[in-house]
Amino acid sequence: MKIFCIGRNYVEHAKELGNEVPDEPVIFMKPKSALLQSHTPFYYPEFSNELHYEAELVLRVSKNGKYINERQASKYYNGITVGIDFTARDIQGELKKKGLPWEKAKAWDNSAVIGKWKEIIPEMLKKPISFSLNKNGENVQKGITTDMIFSFDQIVTNISNYFSLNIGDLIYTGTPAGVGECVVGDVFEGYYEQQRMFELEIK
């Protein structure tokens, strides 16, 4: 299983971090060991002093593919949920200054939170999908697919031009504005529309 992540896929998020808006998807990856299943404890990593949350819609790949046509891309994923791409922002900042890869900041064990899955039916993809993240009962992030720079199908097509997609692969499709720091004791809840997909406490 591979975990693909898309960076800077919402204009306002790119701006809040001082990044340029990309003209094609920014792709990075996490290993299988980064996946944290729902209801599993999450522990603040000892190597970071600035841990940030990034809520995202996540797709589950349901069909093997390579060089996928955008018009056929929706046939290659059948599940959707909300997850968190946890980022050691202090480590990322140091790596970016040196022009180094981000894995130490993004791909460590349990850094990819995943909620319960919702099966996709075609009608779901014909209207905008909204999602949100609450921190200690207060909303901190809201996103909607119409604000994405690259759509689900564009993302799938672009990834498949470089990597083979396999059944069970996951695609984190990017985070909206509102990312921020978290501390031990914070409780996060991720929502797909009005449906809660996960609850997570930082320990």
What residues fall within each predicted segment?
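Catalytic-core "active-site belt" of small-molecule-metabolizing enzymes
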Residues: 1-162, 166, 170, 178-203
